[in-house]
From Swiss-Prot:
It comes from Bacteroides fragilis (strain YCH46). NCBIfam families: hisT_truA (TIGR00071). The active site is at D54 (nucleophile). This is tRNA pseudouridine synthase A. GO terms for molecular function: RNA binding; tRNA pseudouridine(38-40) synthase activity. Substrate binds at Y113. It catalyses: uridine(38/39/40) in tRNA = pseudouridine(38/39/40) in tRNA. Formation of pseudouridine at positions 38, 39 and 40 in the anticodon stem and loop of transfer RNAs. Gene3D superfamilies: Pseudouridine synthase I, catalytic domain, C-terminal subdomain, Pseudouridine synthase I, catalytic domain, N-terminal subdomain. HAMAP family: TruA.
Length: 252
């Protein structure tokens, strides 16, 4: 029997998880998804995600793939069954068949993240916003964000001692916009991201907004390719993976 590959489009609230990737010391999104698939398919099934979100980080859209040997699956039934088996804070939008060599991680052409900050104390969104207590200069922060387009090596914003072979990324979009009177959103899109990269960029841009770093300082931090020179990473609870893009030809 032939082996088919399927993409799962899902969302999750990362509050109570130790990130996407299976961990020895805590529950992960990947583990929950693999358990649900194993129950439904009645065999252990590996799941590969488009990326590895950190502990506490959310996804309004994540993509993962799995293989199945046997008769082609009814994708609507798979999605429906997974939603019954998964916890309330993980939801499957759809499942679709892709070409056998399609890869959720390596075939992704772009990923988009959003980071939310708020200027007010509000109990109902505290898990999804980073509260800022002092005024920020968003014009300066956007000026600094524009410099990201001029560089490709983002070692300064990468978690230290990771197993990645290259720190080269192509940034396609990076901008702060105001969502309402109290909420600002940083949207960033790139072909790939390094571990902790978005939170490190946000944390450093916040230092620019507070007047502790200039736009020139921000540029120098990138050029120094030294994580110790950049700002503290912003908390993970306000970060969302919101989109992953693929070339049309990988779909069946």
């Amino acid at each position: 029997m032939s082996v088919q590959r399927y993409f799962i489009y899902l969302a999750y609230d990362g509050t109570h998880y130790h990130g996407w990737q299976i961990q020895p010391n805590g529950i992960s999104i990947q583990e929950c998804l693999m358990k649900a698939l194993a129950t439904f398919l009645r065999k252990d099934t590996e799941v590969i995600g488009a990326g590895r979100t950190d502990a506490g980080v959310h996804a309004s859209l994540m993509v993962a793939h799995f293989d199945y040997e046997g008769e082609p699956l009814d994708v609507d039934k798979v999605a429906e069954k997974l939603n019954r088996l998964l916890p309330q804070d993980i939801s499957v939008y759809k499942v679709c068949r892709v070409k056998p060599d399609a890869h959720a991680r390596f075939d992704a052409t772009a990923r988009t993240y959003k980071y939310y900050i708020t200027t007010v104390k509000f109990p109902f969104n505290r898990q999804y916003r980073y509260r800022i207590h002092n005024p920020l200069d968003f014009q300066k922060m956007n000026e600094a964000a524009l410099t990201l387009f001029h560089y490709s090596d983002f070692t300064s914003f990468s978690k230290l001692h990771t197993d990645v072979k290259t720190n080269i990324c192509k940034i396609m979009h990076a901008e702060w916009t105001q969502e309402d009177e109290y909420t600002w959103v940083f949207t960033i899109q790139a072909d790939r991201f390094l571990r902790n990269m978005v939170r490190a960029i946000v944390g450093t841009l916040l230092e620019v907004g507070r007047g502790k770093l200039s736009v020139v300082d921000f540029r120098k931090i990138i050029e120094q390719q030294n994580r110790c020179k950049a700002g503290t990473s912003a908390p993970g609870n306000a970060l969302f993976l919101v989109n992953v893009e693929y070339p049309q030809e990988i779909f069946e």
